[in-house]
Design a protein with these regions (language model features):
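MIDAS-like acidic motif and immediate structural context at the N-terminus
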Residues: 76-107, 197-203
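VWA/integrin I-like adhesion module and closely mimicked acidic/polar interface patches used
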Residues: 181, 200-245
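C-terminal helix of von Willebrand factor
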Residues: 250-275
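Acidic/polar low-complexity segments with low predicted structural confidence
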Residues: 1-85
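Von Willebrand factor
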Residues: 139-192, 234-242
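Metal-dependent catalytic core segments for phosphate chemistry
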Residues: 82-85, 89, 94-98, 125-165
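…and closely analogous acidic/polar surface helices at protein-protein or active-site interfaces
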Residues: 96-129, 180, 214
Length: 275
């Protein structure tokens, strides 16, 4: 099931980071909003630790005007700890080897850029995250690759694995998502996000009915949700409107119309996750 990821040139990943540095910074800023950290002030309380001067003044004004004052005039400081784990799951099927129209880049190269940008952004914040990938050759042969695990640093070895990723075979999403969920659910963090990056719908060599694999993927999304894992699909398929909402839900996917702009769209994806 799980296979060793081959290695490439880590310097290529550093080149991606240099090329898209402003975008990586923007992604980091948005991810940071997912779980605020540090001391935050909660206002509008009836049993807080100290008086909120502004609220007290408003209450006095209401009394003088003969109106019923708002009695929630206290506040307290609360420590907010980050409580988030993220898995980026990459579709590495054969179709990712195809060139993007009017470009020298393949879908796989754009997928790699997405993984690298998310990785550097989350690394900067300090949240535990993993980058895994998958392809399939029938229901009994799922190829699952772990490029980076939660307890690993985003270091030279991880970068080499990301550069060494290859595309091949088919796309049995449901099984791969369940396995990704298995690793994600082992993390102690309360909030868990699974970001699937794909260029098409579920497919495999031993299944001729696409509806069956769509249903299986939808079931995987539902099962993960019941266990506390939020799934979001970033799809590069321009025709995904036909099926993606039924699988992932109305507000749990984003279609990238121009795949060359995938790195620029990632901040929008994480912004949607915060809503």
């Amino acid at each position: 099931y799980e296979r060793r990821a081959s290695k490439g040139d880590a310097d290529e990943v550093d080149r991606i980071l240099l090329e898209h540095k402003p975008i990586a910074h923007k992604i980091r800023h948005i991810i940071d909003k997912l779980s605020p950290q540090g001391v935050q002030r909660e206002r509008g309380l009836e049993d807080g630790d100290e008086i909120d001067i502004n609220a007290a003044v408003d209450a006095m004004i209401s009394i003088r005007m003969g109106k019923q004052p708002d009695t929630r005039i206290t506040m307290r400081n609360v420590v907010k700890n980050r409580d988030l784990a993220v898995t980026v799951l990459l579709d590495l099927s054969e179709s990712t080897n195809e060139k993007v129209g009017g470009s020298d880049k393949t879908v796989l190269e754009l997928t790699r850029e997405a993984a690298v940008l998310v990785s550097t952004a989350v690394t900067g914040i300090g949240d535990p995250f993993a980058v895994h990938g998958f392809a399939s050759e029938g229901r009994h042969d799922i190829h699952y690759y772990r490029f980076k695990d939660f307890n690993q640093k985003f270091d030279h070895e991880v970068k080499a694995r990301l550069d060494g990723m290859k595309g091949g075979l088919s796309t049995r999403m449901g099984a791969a998502m369940r396995h990704a969920g298995h690793h994600l659910l082992a993390q102690p963090e309360r909030r868990k996000l699974l970001l699937l990056v794909t260029d098409g719908e579920p497919a495999d060599i031993d299944e001729r009915d696409p509806q069956h694999l769509r249903h299986d993927t939808k079931k995987a999304v539902e099962d993960l949700a019941m266990q506390g894992v939020h799934t979001y699909c970033l799809t590069l398929d321009p025709d995904a409107d036909r099926y993606v909402a039924r699988i992932f839900g109305e507000n749990a996917y984003s279609i990238v119309d121009n795949v060359e702009r995938l790195p620029e769209r990632l901040p929008n994806v994480f912004a949607a996750l915060t809503s």
